[in-house]
């Protein structure tokens, strides 16, 4: 994986003696790739790429976004109109969000149509479904953060859906909203989910997903 000039350098040897870099790189480079693999098997990697773009652009916007019902919309306008390249960062965030959902859906269809969910990869499929649910939750929570008319009513509708569940429906609505009505507590909860809870959740699920794929390899042709 490394050139001869690199492996013979003293710096490389220093790191290799302590971290076994060569062994790790050989293990990565020597992983068998079945001959039937085509471009459609890259959809999972494209979904991950979109997530990394989301993470970077979202992190950049947290320096300017204000998660309050009185300042959220104005802070988004400030990002779009005043911050250097803010319009580009937010636009990339929105575009990559849509692309991430699309790539995720196509990836799920590819795995299903090629039988990648069958034994012994059932748990990989289950974790993948959990990743899909987390991705959709990212979209729902992020949609509300500008706190414009679209975001407000989207939150009101989504948070009101659990009310149809018998016995615990009203309690779930209150839990999601933070109070009986949509307001500051709701925005705070959605912001916390979007910027802290969900990123950690998806990071753990991605790690499990990749470890399983690494262990079991790519499924064979139908």
Swiss-Prot record:
Gene: petB
Pfam families per record: Cytochrome_B
HAMAP family registered for this protein in UniProt: Cytb6_f_cytb6
GO MF terms, alphabetically ordered: electron transporter, transferring electrons within cytochrome b6/f complex of photosystem II activity; metal ion binding; oxidoreductase activity
Other known facts: Heme 1 (or BH or b566) is high-potential and absorbs at about 566 nm, and heme 2 (or BL or b562) is low-potential and absorbs at about 562 nm.
Residues where heme b 2 binds: 90, 93-94, 194
Cellular component GO terms, alphabetical: cytochrome b6f complex; membrane; plasma membrane-derived thylakoid membrane
Species, as recorded: Synechocystis sp. (strain ATCC 27184 / PCC 6803 / Kazusa)
Quaternary state and interactors: The 4 large subunits of the cytochrome b6-f complex are cytochrome b6, subunit IV (17 kDa polypeptide, PetD), cytochrome f and the Rieske protein, while the 4 small subunits are PetG, PetL, PetM and PetN. The complex functions as a dimer.
Biological processes per GO annotation: photosynthesis; respiratory electron transport chain
Name of the molecule in the record: Cytochrome b6
Keyword Ribonucleoprotein: no
């Amino acid at each position: 994986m490394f050139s001869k000039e690199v492996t013979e350098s003293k710096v490389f040897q220093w790191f290799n003696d302590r971290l076994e870099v060569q062994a790790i790189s050989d293990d990565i480079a020597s992983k068998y790739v079945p001959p039937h693999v085509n471009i459609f098997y890259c959809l999972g990697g494209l979904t991950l790429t979109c997530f990394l773009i989301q993470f970077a652009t979202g992190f950049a916007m947290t320096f300017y976004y204000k998660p309050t019902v009185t300042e959220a919309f104005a802070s988004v306008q400030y990002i779009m109109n005043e911050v250097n390249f803010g319009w580009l960062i937010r636009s990339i965030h929105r575009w990559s969000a849509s692309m991430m959902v699309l790539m995720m859906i196509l990836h799920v269809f590819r795995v299903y149509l090629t039988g990648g969910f069958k034994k012994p990869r059932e748990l990989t499929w289950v974790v993948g479904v959990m990743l899909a649910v987390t991705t959709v939750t990212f979209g729902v929570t992020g949609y509300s953060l500008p706190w414009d008319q679209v975001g407000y009513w989207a939150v009101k509708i989504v948070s009101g859906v659990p009310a149809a569940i018998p016995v615990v429906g009203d309690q779930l609505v209150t839990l999601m909203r933070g109070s009986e009505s949509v307001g500051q507590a709701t925005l705070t909860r959605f912001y916390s989910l979007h910027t802290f809870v969900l990123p950690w959740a998806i990071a753990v699920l991605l790690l499990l997903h990749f470890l399983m794929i690494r262990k079991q390899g790519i499924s064979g042709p139908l």
